[in-house]
Amino acid sequence: MNDLKGKNIIVTGASGGIGNSIIKKLNQAGANILASGTRTEKLDELKSKYKNIKTLKFDISQSDKIEEFVENATNELGGSLDCMVNNAGITKDNLAIRMSLEEWKKVIDINLTSTFLMSKFAIKKMLKNKSG
């Protein structure tokens, strides 16, 4: 992961356990990280624990604000983006047979639609930067 030194990376779902592990590895590799999540206290812990990290609270279920989020996150990283780690997502502790259609739609919207939109807008930034 030495080739990530100085690279600007957005990590969604950073306030959870997997996100924290991803950030630890990226930080060890010398990346500049923009960590995003929904829990302010967890994001504050990341800022105090790691160097080269900035945070933005964001809920990826707000699909109409994803383009604005990617813009703001990229600006926080100095205006360029090299990588997007789509780690945010949800699960429902429910069997499909008991899951309502509304619950299913929420899982799909967050885990698929929001990831698609994050990638779409991040790719535009990476192409502009000729990186990623």
For every predicted segment, state its role.
Residues K7, G78-D82, M126-G132:
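Active-site loop of short-chain dehydrogenase/reductase
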Residues S15-G16:
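Conserved glycine-rich cofactor-binding loop
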Residues A29-D44:
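Conserved glycine-rich Rossmann-like NAD(P)H-binding loop of the short-chain dehydrogenase/reductase
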Residues F58-F69, L101:
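The beta1-alpha1 cofactor-binding region of Rossmann-like NAD(H)/NADP(H)-dependent oxidoreductases
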Residues N87-K92:
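Conserved NAD(P)H cofactor-binding loop of Rossmann-fold oxidoreductase domains
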Residues L95-A96, E103-I108:
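Substrate-binding pocket helix/loop in short-chain dehydrogenase/reductase
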Residues S119-K120:
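A short, exposed helix-loop element centered on a Lys and neighboring polar residues
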